[in-house]
């Protein structure tokens, strides 16, 4: 059994690698930094011994790089059993003041890279009628996000895409499972990269990773959450006016700005 994880050099992606290793999976770990991936690989092998861990460098914001990654994996390993689209980042600030190039990179990473990987590997999984795809979304995908407008919008895309694909698979009775996992604040490097501090207490990355992997295998929900509190927020977002949720998000993000 093979699990491919993007953004595996740190945070949730790294901790999910340990979760899959604990379940007996061989791993293909992907990130932009081979040096950091080597450290993760060594940690996993030290803990689990015989676990096969391959590391591959890929910038998932670049379509050609993503296509090359897929082709290389197909040639070397054939079909995989699990794809975890974890790579992603955010930024905080007024939309008209944040850096355009960073916005484009965020969209390409959070949406385009995930989209291409999902399509390519899903096509293979559908042919053999088995496999799992886990897209790491966010509670941010359920509401407008003033001061993090681009990030919130990218995560909304992930949730909607996943729901749509899941329906397509269901109507043909496919055994392939696709799901979107939506954490709230997590104690990772995300807040540093996004230039924010979380106003709510974040969950540990290891706890979130365990919940995410357990949900993929033990739940039949297409969209699921990292805690009851985060699920309640998502439910509120469905019933409250978007103007109200936008106001709440704005006040939350404003407190987070350093």
Where do the model's predicted regions map?
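Residue(s) in the substrate-gating loop at a strand-loop-helix junction
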Residues: 138
């Amino acid at each position: 059994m093979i699990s491919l994880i993007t953004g595996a050099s740190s945070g949730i992606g790294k901790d999910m690698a340990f979760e899959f290793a604990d379940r007996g999976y061989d791993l293909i770990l992907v990130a932009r930094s081979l040096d950091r991936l080597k450290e993760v690989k060594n940690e996993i092998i030290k803990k689990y011994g015989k676990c096969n861990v391959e590391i591959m460098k890929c910038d998932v914001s670049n379509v050609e790089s993503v296509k090359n990654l897929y082709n290389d994996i197909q040639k070397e390993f054939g079909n995989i059993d699990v794809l975890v689209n974890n790579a992603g980042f955010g930024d905080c600030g007024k939309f008209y003041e944040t850096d355009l190039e960073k916005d484009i990179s965020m969209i390409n990473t959070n949406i385009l890279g995930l989209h291409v990987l999902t399509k390519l590997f899903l096509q293979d999984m559908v042919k053999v009628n088995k496999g799992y795809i886990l897209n790491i979304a966010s509670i941010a995908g359920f509401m407008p996000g003033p001061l993090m407008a681009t990030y919130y919008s990218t995560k909304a895309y992930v949730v909607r895409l996943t729901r749509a694909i899941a329906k397509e698979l269901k109507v043909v009775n496919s055994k392939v499972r696709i799901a979107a996992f939506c954490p709230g604040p997590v104690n990772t490097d995300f807040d540093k990269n996004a230039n924010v501090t979380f106003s709510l207490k974040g969950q540990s990355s290891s706890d979130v990773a365990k919940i995410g992997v357990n949900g993929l295998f033990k739940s039949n929900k297409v969209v699921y959450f990292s805690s009851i509190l985060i699920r309640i927020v998502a439910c509120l977002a469905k019933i409250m006016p978007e103007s109200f949720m936008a106001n709440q998000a704005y006040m939350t993000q404003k407190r987070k700005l350093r």
